[in-house]
Amino acid sequence: KTLVTTAAELKTAIETADGTADAPTQIILGGSFEVAADAEHFAFSIDGKHIAIDDGNNPISGDNYSISRTASDKSLFELTNGASLKLTNLNIYGNAAAHSADVACIFVRASCKLTLGNGFELYSGDGFVDDQLIGISVGDNATLIMEGDAEISKSIKGQEVLVAPTGILQLKGGKIKAREEGTYESERSLCLQAAINGNQVTIPTVTVENELPADSDFKLDLYDYVLSSSTVRPGAETVVKGTDSYTLTDSYRMKFHLMTNTTGGMTYYDSYFELYLDGNAIKIRAK
């Protein structure tokens, strides 16, 4: 295990990591630090590496150590070329103040996997009502796994997590919460994007695989899941699924709230559509 207490030490530990997917390089965070405003666009690039970062835990306060960025035009982590990263018992502060699609706190690119374990917390920022801050961007064929009490929260305008059409979100625990301030439509936390190719539609795979925290509250922002104010796009009916080993109940359906549907430049609020439980899946239908 490698102990790091500065951004420079963490960068070096990542660059020299030689772990595998089954036995990732173990890095222990031994102190809180900020990433300087003059840092590279991606402060920590994880290119084909397999890494697990855990918190050494502040011996005085017992609180998690944290990584934060001083400028919201920088991204903290980027995973590329099949990389994997697990973050446990640490806090990340995005300190974002405005929306920009290329400055998510964490980018998970194609074929990469990010796991957020127990004790992880991400606060992406404090934007204005018309901003769209992104905490984590999950690209096509990329995977985000949330476990235990992992939490992503506290931005004003949702998109705490943005999942591309062939992206995967596995909920083995965890919660993604919007901060309940500003206008009603600004309270979104999970954005799912569909892709349209002729008559074919591709949508993200979202599964609930274990018990979720009692205060889980996923506020959904769906893109291209509907055709109009009264019609769900064929093939885009299923929003969340259970698994063979975990069956959804209506109490789980109530942890997911449909806030907005956007298609063709039009946004439809929850007065037009609703979520309902159908077998082991949460689906969308017109009211």
Region locations from a protein language model:
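Ankyrin repeat (ANK) tandem alpha-helical domains that serve as protein-protein interaction scaffolds
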Residues: T143, I168-Q170
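Extracellular/surface-exposed low-complexity segments
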Residues: K1-G19, K172-E181, E187-K287
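Extracellular beta-strand-rich solenoid/capping regions of secreted or surface-exposed proteins
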Residues: V35-A52, N64-T88, Y93-L114, V129, ...
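Short, solvent-exposed loop/turn segments that connect beta-strands within catalytic domains
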Residues: A21-A23, A98-S100, F128-V129, G198-Q200
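Solvent-exposed loop/turn tips at the surfaces of repeat/solenoid architectures
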Residues: K49, G56, D63-Y65, T70, ...
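Glycine-rich repeat segments that build the extracellular carbohydrate-interaction surface of secreted
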Residues: L3-T5, A17-A36, H50-I60, L87
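A generic structural signal for beta-strand entry/edge sites
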Residues: P24, H50, K74-L76, S84, ...
